[in-house]
């Protein structure tokens, strides 16, 4: 059975307009609390940076990264790590302040999703990806990360500040 990564992106902003699943009560409560505290709504939060579509009541995202790459999965979250790679971090879970669309999709997957984690774009850009691009006698891994490195370049277009972009992901079997 194969394992796939469900890779979503968020942007830290005071804008609240996005396409995708919404929880009207959460949006209302955030706005109301902000107005009560500040006199106007200026609160920053994470919103989805993905493009979402609704197909007969089911929401799905056009994910920035959607390849099946067990080598990358091992690096990101110690998933399918038959390579004995030291992961960047053990899975961190879904951030409490994650945007509603991501929480929605995680809930839709219920127990079939696992190893939930996240990194800011800044964290991913600081990784020395070349150290993982090694040529071993049994397999050439020199280009296994090219697609993901291209994704990182595309993610830079979401916001000039890489700390304002967060990648939230999980895996299925």
Residues of each region from the PLM?
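Acidic (Asp/Glu-rich) sequence patches and key acidic residues
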Residues: 1-164, 171-173
